[in-house]
């Protein structure tokens, strides 16, 4: 009995000691007043000027903005795009607005678009809606359907359509029965040639005379030259209603 009472007394003593003990809790952590270094005071994330690549083969670098919804593309200011998926390469100081397959490019830029066999350089503007082509300033092109007219200080090599053009309006387009020669008059197939940009395209019934005059009735094409016909306007006007082509003003 004595041992049992001793055991009970010992247990009671231990319980009392445990109850009397002080349980210390960890002090509450005061919130830091230091701002996150990765965010500005307004809470917006810091804009980082680094390169990145997306799943559509797009590479973008430095001080630019991209808005790309679906296949639409908008790019602004001081950036570089390499869009190999669509065969597009664009560099330096330009703006692209590409909605669907429409294309608009302006000012001091270079385009190499091998997918459509197009190469264009320097000081020009391209507006390409659907497959139509419109280019202005220093060699204007208006290509509606498959009609094509290009002038001065540029080079086009468009092998996809069998077209090769070099240096001040020389054309050799054998794929479509087109041949251009200089200083060789020919009277075959209703053809007559004089000086500066002669075209002999007998396959399509083409007649061109003197400083880029074209009279092509077979395809609804009529062009008149300086002081030759009363309906002539300003050194190289083309009115090609059959293909919806109109070009005016001095080159």
Curated annotation (Swiss-Prot):
Subcellular locations according to the entry: Secreted
Main subcellular localisation: secreted
GO cellular component, one term: extracellular region
Keywords: Cleavage on pair of basic residues, Neuropeptide, Secreted, Signal
InterPro entries registered for this protein in UniProt: ORCKA/B
Biological processes per GO annotation: neuropeptide signaling pathway
Propiece span(s): 21-46, 225-231, 249-251
Signal peptide: 1-20
Molecular-function GO terms, alphabetical: neuropeptide hormone activity
Family from the record: Belongs to the orcokinin family.
Listed PANTHER family: NEUROPEPTIDE-LIKE PROTEIN, NEUROPEPTIDE-LIKE PROTEIN-RELATED
Physiological role: Myotropic peptides that enhance both the frequency and amplitude of spontaneous hindgut contractions.
Full protein name: Orcokinin peptides type A
Organism: Procambarus clarkii
Lineage: Eukaryota, Metazoa, Ecdysozoa, Arthropoda, Crustacea
